[in-house]
């Protein structure tokens, strides 16, 4: 009988043995209990994900968003947290927010963020191997599941009771209620009473988010002299609204396109002799080929890494707009939506703590995600107040589109990371 293992099997055995030894040395007995609790909870986590995904909750479906909240409130109550629903004024078209908190006095005060609303509706939950499909799976109902079951694992291990943890799940992240000072008042209040904030937007793949770009709307309005097209470019007529808009958009492109982390997208344009503005934000134009266009509107967005970058970009855009072609007049207006989550040193320090957790779990290093790869998010409203880290949710793809999915292998992985990070922060 040959007592030697084949070399490949032997190497694998030694690797597993060493990994087990390292894992055992890195985690305390209580931390091992938390990790074991996460593993044991996977069937429950999958069930909660399915139930939340099967509730259609696009932002404008206020009833659906509230149904998600009604499903989650008793779950947080079951792990000893006090809960309430934060209503928004009726005219804001926002379902409101779910708030939960522990009543302890130990460790850092931790604020956890997520959102219950989605962009699309209609695609029900289905599982195909290690992937779960459905509207809002990745963005971000799986993130809510990670957040909740991280806390439940702490509760199961007796490590949640004396902590100072707040949870805020918004109902309008995908289309923020206006005015923002009202829709995000509870978030700002919670942040001011916290030492740090963690957000559970989709993440995984050994990356986390220390910075997110802000988001702003802009609208360009052009008016011009109108008349028979045979007179265009003459001093008496000028250049028309469409040539003026083309000049402005081209100068935006030439002047701003190469600035790092800055993007601007003219998404809607309509121009002609007359414009009609619809209640739903639509713009329609009429005109004739032999008439110089009198009006034009362009709408778009602006994304930026800091308030300073936003202000500088707006100043350049305003200057470009002011240099009108003959016979035209233009103005540009801006509207704030999401502030930027700038890459502060304190955010990187939180990332280092998550990286230590990940390596202690044997899951590898955590690197910061390039801010250019991520859009705006709720955490940006409070990231200037306290240290902030995002991207703690599960990995997925196809967000805001049919075929959206979450990688179920990362559901447990991310829950373990989040649970141990919260545990260490609250000791």
What is each residue range found by the language model?
Residues 1-7, 162:
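Positively charged n-region of N-terminal signal peptides that target proteins for export
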Residues 10-21:
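Bacterial N-terminal signal peptides
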Residues 25-135, 155-160:
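Acidic/His- and Gly-rich active-site-bordering loop/insert found
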Residues 25-29, 33, 40, 57, ...:
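Metal-dependent amide/peptide-bond hydrolase catalytic core
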Residues 46-50, 69, 73, 148-151, ...:
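Extracytoplasmic/secreted envelope proteins and their assembly/folding machinery
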Residues 106-169, 190, 402, 407-409, ...:
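Active-site metal-coordination/substrate-binding segment of hydrolases
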Residues 116-128, 211-222, 356:
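Acidic-glycine-rich active-site phosphate/pyrophosphate-binding loop
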Residues 140-217, 271-278, 426-427:
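Acidic/histidine-rich catalytic neighborhood of metal-dependent amide-processing enzymes
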């Amino acid at each position: 009988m040959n007592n030697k293992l084949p070399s490949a099997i032997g190497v694998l055995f030694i690797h597993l043995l060493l990994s087990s030894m390292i894992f055992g040395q890195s985690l305390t007995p209580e931390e091992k209990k938390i990790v074991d609790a996460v593993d044991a909870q996977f069937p429950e986590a999958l069930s909660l994900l399915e139930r939340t995904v099967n509730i259609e909750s696009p932002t404008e479906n206020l009833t659906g968003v509230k149904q998600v909240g009604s499903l989650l409130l008793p779950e947080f109550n079951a792990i000893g947290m006090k809960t309430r629903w934060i209503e928004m004024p009726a005219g804001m078209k926002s379902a409101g927010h779910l708030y939960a908190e522990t009543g302890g006095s130990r460790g850092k005060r931790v604020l956890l963020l997520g959102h219950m609303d989605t962009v699309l509706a209609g695609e029900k939950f289905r599982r195909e191997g290690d992937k779960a499909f459905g509207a809002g799976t990745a963005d971000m109902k799986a993130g809510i599941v990670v957040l909740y079951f991280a806390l439940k694992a702490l509760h199961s291990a007796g490590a949640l009771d004396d902590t100072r943890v707040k949870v805020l799940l918004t109902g309008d992240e995908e289309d923020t209620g206006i005015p923002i000072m009202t829709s995000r008042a509870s978030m700002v209040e919670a942040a001011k009473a916290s030492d740090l904030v963690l957000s559970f937007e989709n993440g995984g793949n050994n990356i986390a988010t220390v910075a997110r770009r802000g988001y702003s709307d802009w609208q360009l309005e052009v008016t011009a002299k109108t008349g028979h097209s045979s007179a265009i470019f003459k001093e008496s007529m000028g250049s028309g609204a469409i040539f003026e808009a083309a000049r402005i958009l081209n100068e935006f492109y030439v002047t701003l396109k190469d600035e790092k982390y800055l993007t601007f997208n003219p998404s809607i344009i309509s121009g002609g002799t007359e414009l009609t503005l619809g209640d739903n934000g639509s713009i329609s134009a009429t005109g004739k080929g032999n008439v110089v266009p009198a009006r034009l509107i362009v709408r778009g967005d602006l994304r930026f890494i800091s308030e300073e970058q936003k202000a500088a970009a707006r100043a350049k855009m305003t200057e470009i707009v002011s240099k009108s072609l003959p016979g035209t007049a233009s103005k540009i207006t801006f509207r704030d939506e999401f502030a930027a989550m700038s890459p502060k040193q304190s955010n990187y320090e939180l990332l280092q703590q998550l990286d230590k957790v990940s390596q202690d779990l044997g899951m590898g290093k955590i690197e910061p995600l390039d801010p250019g790869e991520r859009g705006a998010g709720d955490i940006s409203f409070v990231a200037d107040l306290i240290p902030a880290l995002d991207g703690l949710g599960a990995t997925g793809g196809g967000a805001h589109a049919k075929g959206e999915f979450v990688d179920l292998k990362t559901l447990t992985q991310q829950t373990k990371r989040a649970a141990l990070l919260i545990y260490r922060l609250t000791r």
